[in-house]
Amino acid sequence: MMQKQNMIVVNQKEIAKNIYELVLQGTLVQQMNEPGQFVHIKVAEGIAPLLRRPISICNVDQEKNEFTMLYRAEGQGTKTLATRKQGEMVDVLGPLGHGFPVEEAEAGQTALLVGGGIGVPPLYELSQRLVAKGVRVIHILGFQTKDVVFYEEKFAELGDTYVATVDGTHGTKGFVTDVIDHYGIDFDILYSCGPLAMLRALEGRYKEKKAYISLEERMGCGIGACFACVCHLQEDPSGHSYKKVCSDGPVFPIGEVVL
């Protein structure tokens, strides 16, 4: 159930170039039960910047009432958020959206989790949930260069983990699909989050597989009211049918929406 709460900053640190790990605490965490959901953060007091920032939920610890989110500090809003210190309060709205269907993976099956850039974080909580129910996980994490690689070791604790960098400075040179081809990776179910180009490449390969993708879109309200994040359905060539990424997604079955 969505709630709005002022949450306390437990810790914040830069874990890669311009990539920050922020841990917040509050009872709102008890509502975070679906990996792949996101929160809307009010990054500063006052009206500037006006819009909240959507940030995915990376890790949930309900015993401590803490959750972790990772984000890239690149615009005015996220750069402001990066200045928040331990003990300060952050206005959080969430959890929002529909996450990854963990129930679609069965114990003993192999799940392939593919993340690109800042699309990697929500896969961490998902991976933990899958491992807990006896699913074998394989991770492929794609980044531009080694300076922005993060959470490789954390994912490796859960299952086989491969990294691809576009410039070849870490792991396999190229894209996540190059890793799949090089190692001949097979799987029963696919979960993915990242840039559209990556999602399109995966859709082109695995449209007949059981697969789910999370779309990264710039969202305004986060609750389906402003229509800033609509995407059209593939089954309707007229373009009149659509779904809203923030409320109907951000996770969709592969092949359902136009990428």
UniProtKB/Swiss-Prot annotation:
What is the protein's given name? Dihydroorotate dehydrogenase B (NAD(+)), electron transfer subunit
Q: What CDD domains has UniProt attached to this entry?
A: DHOD_e_trans (cd06218)
**Biological role stated in the UniProt entry:** Responsible for channeling the electrons from the oxidation of dihydroorotate from the FMN redox center in the PyrD type B subunit to the ultimate electron acceptor NAD(+).
GO MF terms on file?
A: 2 iron, 2 sulfur cluster binding; electron transfer activity; flavin adenine dinucleotide binding; metal ion binding; oxidoreductase activity
Cofactor remark? Binds 1 [2Fe-2S] cluster per subunit.
Q: Does the keyword Iron apply?
A: yes
**InterPro entries hit by this protein:** Cyt_c3_hydrogenase_gsu (IPR012165), Dihydroorotate_DH_ele_sf (IPR037117), Dihydroorotate_DH_Fe-S-bd (IPR019480), Dihydroorotate_DHASE_ETsu (IPR023455), FAD-bd_FR_type (IPR017927), FNR_nucleotide-bd (IPR039261), OxRdtase_FAD/NAD-bd (IPR001433), PyrK_electron_transfer (IPR050353)
Which Pfam families does its entry note? DHODB_Fe-S_bind (PF10418), NAD_binding_1 (PF00175)
Cofactor(s), by name = [2Fe-2S] cluster; FAD
Q: Write out the similarity annotation.
A: Belongs to the PyrK family.
Positions of FAD binding: R53, P54, I55, S56, L70, Y71, R72, G77, T78
Subunit architecture: Heterotetramer of 2 PyrK and 2 PyrD type B subunits.
Which positions are annotated as binding [2Fe-2S] cluster?
C221, C226, C229, C246
What biological processes does GO assign it?
'de novo' UMP biosynthetic process
